[in-house]
Amino acid sequence: MTGNWLIMEMNGLAQIGILYPQFILSGQWLSQALGSLEEELDRQIYPDGFQYELSTGYADVVINNYQRFIEVAKAFGKTVSEGMLEKLAKACELDVKLMMPDGCVPDINDGKHRNVEETFQCRKRIFPENKTIRWITEKFETGEPDFTSIALPWSGFLVMRTGWTTEDSWALFDAAPFGKAHQHEDKLSLLFYANGKLLLTEGGNYAYDTSEMRRYVLSTRAHNTVRVDAKDQNRLKNYAWKEEDIREKADLKWKLGPVWDYGESNYREGYGENPCPGTVHNRRVFFNKSQKEGKTPFLVVVDRMASDEIHRYEWLWHIDSELEAVQKGRISFHEIDAAFSAEEAEVIEGREEPEWQGFKAVGTKQGMYRKLPCVSIKADAGQIRIVTVLSPCKGLSGRVHKVTASAMPEEDSVVISFEDGTEIAFREQEIIQTV
């Protein structure tokens, strides 16, 4: 037995060893369980605190099982090592690093949109003096993190935010390894929270059944990344977890600054039933936080596709807002604009044929899903560069008129023209070098 199941079993064995001292082997059971629990922390938790399934649901399951053992151990006068407590505290603090402005962690992989304060009210029982936990649960003034945006170098997520209030903006870039279990085919996907809402969302987590909806949420189709020739990413096909993977850093570059945050990664493991690594997707994400002229922070996403053959590329953006207008180079929603340097685009919502597209799970039980607009941008090419701007808006502020950017991969200039007459022009390398 491995993974979170092993931790559950060792939690149970440890508690039996504590609660039933009349059994001759109780001490041996406790010792065996403690040894395994210590080993699994090193085996399953990345140095940045994320459990190796990379799920915001199962990371919590693992911590819960350690906490249940620790509370019983302390109640019966048993010693819990400082090393175990330190590693668990770091794993707990991951929730704050990932936390959206609504106070919840995002639904990553087979994850859960989970309230951090509710979780930490429980965690406080084993970490009563932890400043981060007290900041969340008691509004403890000195516990506020000394960072806003942060990278998780081993688990491969980049969290970009403007601050810690409910009015702030937040974005998540997924450059993660595939993870040990409960994975979705979603490398290079993005989430974006602004104006009090997760505007750029995804399919989410759904019931563990064999339905079309379950297949959809697992697939690239349900995420904000690129498909090739109507085929999804397929890391699962050739995937095998290795023990040393827990110590390997992810393929993630980043820089964080007062005006721009930047992240970059690649997907090169192939698409379709028999994936061949002939197509490389490089994605750069630029998060503008300046809020000049009253604009809400916005995302600039630069994608470069590279192949020796001509392919049909498809960019997907799942927007949780009411559609207003479809125009050349721009699709407007009530709360956000999606502007792009490609020419061909459509909005798909609640489509079941020829394949499911434009849905979002609203729970993990069967039937708990709804329709959701999905922007589909397409281009035929071998080598191509496409720039997409995702700009939240209130009234005229933030409305994008157009994006001007060359399709040549070697070019790096971007010009964003807004409806209010303002313009932002930059070169990718200038931002990367000066952040």
Please state what every model-predicted region is.
Residues 9, 62-65, 222:
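Catalytic-loop motifs flanking and including active-site residues across diverse enzymes
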Residues 1-7, 11:
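Extended ligand-binding groove/face enriched in aromatic
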Residues 3, 112, 118-120, 206-435:
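CBM-like, beta-strand-rich accessory domains located in the C-terminal region of large
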Residues 31-43, 388:
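Short, charged, amphipathic alpha-helices and their helix-cap/turn boundaries
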Residues 46, 50-200, 379-385, 400-435:
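Carbohydrate-active enzyme catalytic cores, enriched for enzymes
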Residues 11-18:
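Tandem amphipathic alpha-helical repeat scaffolds
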